A protein has these predicted regions:
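Macrodomain-like recognition of ADP-ribose-binding/processing modules
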Residues: 1-243
Length: 243
């Protein structure tokens, strides 16, 4: 499974244009849940599912052996980590070089990795995300993972004037790749809104605004929370857009 994913995964560089023609023909069902990403994806096993990985573009898998953020959880529960390790030179070393030569700052860039047929074989447990439970073999399922890093606003002194334009372009590339690869379901969420301190209101508004142009059957914003999601920025953004 890992060899197959590595053989078929690819990177889309910032400068690559993959615009998808806009022709809205599908009624999209939107869901906001408190689930974790793979927990949400499991409900659609058997469909072509894209899951957004809220990545760190310098460290492979974030800190998968001890931290408990979304990317680390994805890596511990699936075959994703060795696939990302295979992109060490083209993706991670590239970004180290760009940072060290000051060709890239905290805003990062639009590079992303598409990893198909990642096998999820452990439960994405909210009670103890560092030690997920092995699932029975018949419960395993596959997802397609899009690895893309949000701006690291936790180290920014102020928001640049083009902040929303950058976020919009990056989200559009994520959605374009998911659509081009014929995903029926996409699992999104509070991308970059944790440690990277991007504002949920902006991320939610731009996701919802752009998603109206795509033909996904189901979009689920999995917010990994025990709180009531009805008051979340994502629910409010959907209500404002009447979708």
């Amino acid at each position: 499974a890992v060899q197959n994913s590595i053989a078929n995964q690819f990177m889309v560089a910032e400068e690559e244009n993959i615009d998808q023609p806009i022709s809205k023909t599908t009624h999209t069902r939107y869901i906001v849940s408190g689930k974790r990403s793979f927990e949400a994806a499991k409900d659609y096993a058997g469909k072509n599912i894209a899951v957004l990985n809220y990545a760190n573009n310098l460290s492979i898998g974030g800190a998968p052996f001890y931290a408990g953020a979304q990317e680390e959880s994805l890596c511990r529960c699936s075959t994703l980590l060795p696939c990302l390790q295979a992109m060490k030179a083209s993706f991670y070393h590239k970004h180290h070089e760009l940072y060290s030569t000051k060709q890239m700052d905290f805003m990062g860039n639009d590079d992303l990795i598409y990893t198909p047929e990642v096998v999820v074989f452990k439960s994405d447990e909210r009670t103890d995300p560092v030690y997920p439970r092995m699932m029975n073999r018949e419960e395993w399922f596959k997802v397609n993972v899009i690895t893309c890093a949000a701006p690291q606003m936790q180290i920014a002194k102020k928001y640049p004037s083009n902040y929303e334009d950058v976020i919009r372009a990056r989200i559009k590339k994520i959605l374009d790749v998911a659509a081009k690869e014929k995903n029926e379901v996409i699992i999104l969420g509070a991308w970059g809104c944790g440690a990277f301190k991007n504002p949920k209101e902006v991320v939610a508004r731009l996701f919802v605004d752009l998603l109206k142009n795509y033909n996904f059957e189901i979009v689920e914003f999995a917010l990994a929370t025990r709180n009531d999601v009805q008051g979340s920025a994502f629910t409010r953004a959907l209500q404002r857009n009447k979708v």
